[in-house]
Amino acid sequence: MAILRTSEIRTMTIEERADELENLKNELVRERALTSAGGAPDNPGRIGEIRRTIARIKTIQHELNEI
């Protein structure tokens, strides 16, 4: 899954943003589970990138009064 830019998030529909947010949350849970189980993540910076992308989506949702 690619990290989304703010401009890409703004062009999405409400449903697409909600779906992407849910997918990212699930991916974050999987990455954290892998780390907590003692496994080494493929890309250690991925967790931070996922968190920032989730924050971007939520920020835009608040700006557009979707929440």
From Swiss-Prot:
| Gene Ontology terms: biological process | translation
What InterPro entries does the record tag this protein with?
Answer: Ribosomal_uL29, Ribosomal_uL29_CS, Ribosomal_uL29_sf
Q: Where does the signal sequence lie?
A: none
MF terms (GO), sorted A to Z: structural constituent of ribosome
Entry's PROSITE patterns?
RIBOSOMAL_L29 (PS00579)
Q: Provide this UniProt record's keywords sorted from A to Z.
A: Ribonucleoprotein, Ribosomal protein
| GO CC annotations on file | ribonucleoprotein complex; ribosome
Pfam families reported in the protein's UniProt record: Ribosomal_L29
The family line of this record is: Belongs to the universal ribosomal protein uL29 family.
Q: What is this protein called?
A: Large ribosomal subunit protein uL29
- The protein's organism comes out as Methanosarcina mazei (strain ATCC BAA-159 / DSM 3647 / Goe1 / Go1 / JCM 11833 / OCM 88)
Its taxonomic placement starts with: Archaea, Methanobacteriati, Methanobacteriota, Stenosarchaea group, Methanomicrobia
